[in-house]
Curated annotation (Swiss-Prot):
Transmembrane segments: 532-552
Species this chain originates from: Influenza A virus (strain A/Duck/Hong Kong/2986.1/2000 H5N1 genotype C)
InterPro entries, per database record: Capsid_hemagglutn, Hemagglutn_HA1_a/b_dom_sf, Hemagglutn_influenz_A, Hemagglutn_influenz_A/B
Pfam families (UniProt xref): Hemagglutinin (PF00509)
UniProt record, GO biological process: clathrin-dependent endocytosis of virus by host cell; fusion of virus membrane with host endosome membrane; fusion of virus membrane with host plasma membrane; viral budding from plasma membrane; virion attachment to host cell
Compartmental location: Virion membrane; Host apical cell membrane
Site annotation Cleavage: residues: R346, G347
SUPFAM superfamilies for the chain: Influenza hemagglutinin (stalk), Viral protein domain
Role noted for this protein: Binds to sialic acid-containing receptors on the cell surface, bringing about the attachment of the virus particle to the cell. This attachment induces virion internalization of about two third of the virus particles through clathrin-dependent endocytosis and about one third through a clathrin- and caveolin-independent pathway. Plays a major role in the determination of host range restriction and virulence. Class I viral fusion protein.
Gene (UniProt): HA
Descriptive protein name: Hemagglutinin
Length: 568
């Protein structure tokens, strides 16, 4: 009878109603790194490092770049005859110059403060070329004879289009005194130059006067130049050299020129009609007839990610450049399907729901939820409230990280002349240092936020478990694996009340108490039965052993194998 009661009790325990708390799992193979672990598989993740580009030069916010092709900035501004396609250019978003353009200063020489001029151009989006001193106004000097085979055009000698090389006329070079007053509302970029002959004979041949000078003055500029006559090696067939200068003439200011030889006079100037963010980008790419918000020398980036690893030099609304190869943010949970046992490991920032052995692939409509089983069946149900709060929290966190890191950031190359190489090297070291710091900060941020996110999910599962536990109290038994076993019948309506937090503890407490006491009594009674059976079994086996030993002894004595002596 006792065995029958025990068997019925066991059967009733197996068929008890249950509710379990768990979390979502899927077939994702996405992996993230945290402070504590590497390559943690998660249900959802978001890459925040852009690694792709289109390999083209594109319009920036609908404005085309000025692609100088085989011309340099100097060749464009002075008017190298091979750069005639850039005589008048529309508004540009940025300027593209090749690393070693073929059409630079056709007549050999130097461009003074060239790097500073390029820096100025990085804040200009449009020039308007205007004539300030007409070529025809030089009646006392030869304005058309100043050409060179170093600057050919259609097989003939020519010269820079925007300046005039003045030569003596009728064996005389009268002293020049010219002024130009800037009556425009915009600043003017004005260029001029000086010719340095190869020897004294060339000096008098071109300018008649053996000793010459050039004076240039504005409200902020006071310059006096003299030619440097010296024997030099030929470049582009020329032993002479030319040196070019520039200045910005403010509105209502005047520029004054005085010279008695070697003067390369301005004919055209550039009115700065639009200022803005621009850049001079070194690139060999071709125009791709495309549009972008971020351009690099390697190609355009169209991405909302906060970081990229394509090229450190950029123009536009660009992510920050880092040296990392991988930056992935966890947005979902640890992906540990139920077939795999979960390691009970505590995170860095909070408690982990390590009592749950694995996630549920059957629960697809939420991150956290329930699995129940009763006489009416079984099924999964997501906890929509906790899931939505978690989604909002993680989404806000990811957006916050992206917003904080996605500030408008431009990094354009700086150019230095030969005398500034030490400054250039120091600048490169500083920029490399900044990139190292940015990279370290980005990687550390991702590691810490991933740790927080995973612990945040674990904490939410534990909170859901505690919510159920506090409702059920002693009306159910904790099984230690995230499940509760009811001491009373719990139909679907009852299960739903547990899930939505309206479980009526008093309604089921009496039934639960009786079932709990009955199960406890069965356990005690069955324990007493087992004790009696064990004592009986011990005594019986001992008695049987004694009889066997006595019988064996008598048999051995009877056949002489064993001698028995009784001493009194």
């Amino acid at each position: 009878m006792e065995k029958i009661v025990l068997l019925l009790a066991i059967v009733s325990l197996v068929k008890s109603d249950q509710i379990c708390i768990g979390y979502h799992a899927n077939n994702s193979t996405e992996q993230v790194d945290t402070i504590m672990e590497k390559n943690v598989t998660v249900t959802h993740a978001q890459d925040i490092l852009e690694k792709t580009h289109n390999g083209k030069l594109c319009d920036l916010d609908g404005v085309k770049p000025l692609i100088l092709r085989d011309c340099s900035v100097a060749g464009w501004l002075l008017g190298n005859p091979m750069c005639d396609e850039f005589i008048n250019v529309p508004e540009w978003s940025y300027i593209v110059e090749k690393a070693s353009p073929a059409n630079d200063l056709c007549y050999p020489g130097d461009f003074n403060d060239y790097e500073e001029l390029k820096h100025l151009l990085s804040r200009i989006n449009h020039f308007e070329k205007i004539q300030i001193i007409p070529k025809s106004s030089w009646s006392n000097h030869e304005a058309s004879s100043g050409v060179s085979s170093a600057c050919p055009y259609q097989g003939k000698s020519s010269f820079f289009r925007n300046v005039v090389w003045l030569i003596k006329k009728n064996s005389a070079y009268p002293t020049i005194k010219r002024s130009y007053n800037n009556t425009n509302q915009e600043d003017l970029l004005i260029l001029w130059g000086i010719h340095h002959p190869n020897d004294a004979a060339e000096q008098t041949k071109l300018y008649q006067n053996p000793t010459t000078y050039i004076s240039v003055g504005t409200s902020t500029l006071n310059q006096r130049l003299v030619p440097k006559i010296a024997t030099r090696s030929k470049v582009n067939g020329q032993s002479g050299r030319m040196e070019f200068f520039w200045t910005i003439l403010k509105p209502n200011d005047a520029i004054n020129f005085e010279s008695n030889g070697n003067f390369i006079a301005p004919e055209y100037a550039y009115k700065i009609v639009k200022k803005g963010d621009s850049a001079i980008m070194k690139s060999e790419l071709e125009y791709g007839n495309c549009n972008t918000k971020c351009q690099t020398p390697m190609g355009a980036i169209n991405s909302s990610m906060p970081f990229h690893n394509i090229h450190p030099l950029t123009i536009g609304e660009c992510p920050k450049y880092v040296k990392s190869n991988r930056l992935v943010l966890a947005t979902g949970l640890r992906n540990t399907p139920q077939r795999e046992r979960r390691r009970k490991k505590r995170g860095l920032f909070g408690a982990i729901a390590g009592f749950i052995e694995g996630g549920w692939q059957g629960m697809v409509d939420g991150w956290y939820g329930y699995h129940h089983s009763n006489e009416q069946g079984s099924g999964y149900a997501a906890d929509k409230e906790s899931t939505q709060k978690a989604i909002d929290g993680v989404t806000n966190k990811v957006n916050s990280i992206i917003d904080k890191m996605n500030t408008q950031f431009e990094a354009v190359g700086r150019e230095f002349n030969n005398l500034e190489r030490r400054i250039e090297n120091l600048n490169k070291k500083m920029e490399d240092g900044f990139l190292d710091v940015w990279t370290y900060n980005a990687e550390l941020l991702v590691l810490m936020e991933n740790e927080r996110t995973l612990d945040f999910h674990d904490s939410n599962v534990k909170n859901l478990y505690d919510k159920v536990r506090l409702q059920l109290r002693d009306n159910a038994k904790e099984l230690g694996n995230g499940c509760f076993e009811f001491y009373h019948k719990c139909d679907n309506e009852c299960m739903e009340s547990v899930k939505n937090g309206t479980y009526d503890y008093p309604q089921y407490s009496e039934e639960a108490r009786l079932n709990r006491e009955e199960i406890s009594g069965v356990k005690l009674e069955s324990m007493g039965t087992y004790q009696i059976l064990s004592i009986y079994s011990t005594v019986a086996s001992s008695l049987a052993l004694a009889i066997m030993v006595a019988g064996l002894s008598l048999w051995m004595c009877s056949n002489g194998s064993l001698q028995c002596r009784i001493c009194i």
